[in-house]
């Protein structure tokens, strides 16, 4: 399902637990698009790189609310 794509953007936090730990991240692109990061193993690794730029490849789907979700196959943290 979905289409394979590569996006670039800032890794941003989107959900937290009661203690303020980040549970989920998104990639915010220069085009003001937000891609929620699926909670697979690679996606969870991206949480370590909050507020850094990354190039992320994976399958993109749209959920029933119209939000874009990327299931991360591979990623690369970019130098500024």
Language-model region placement:
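Low-complexity, Gly/Pro
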Residues: 1-3, 16, 34, 75-80
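Short nucleic-acid-contacting surface segments enriched for D/E, G, S/T with interspersed K/R
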Residues: 42-57
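OB-fold/S1-family single-stranded nucleic acid-binding modules
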Residues: 62-80
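Short beta-strand segments
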Residues: 5-7, 33-36, 68
């Amino acid at each position: 399902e979905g289409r394979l794509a590569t996006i670039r953007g800032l890794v941003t936090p989107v959900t937290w637990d009661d203690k303020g730990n980040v549970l989920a991240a998104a990639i915010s692109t220069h085009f003001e698009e937000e891609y929620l990061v699926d909670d697979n193993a690679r996606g969870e690794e991206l949480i370590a790189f909050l507020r850094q730029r990354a190039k992320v490849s994976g399958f993109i789907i749209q959920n029933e609310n119209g939000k874009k979700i990327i299931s991360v196959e591979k990623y690369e943290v970019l130098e500024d």
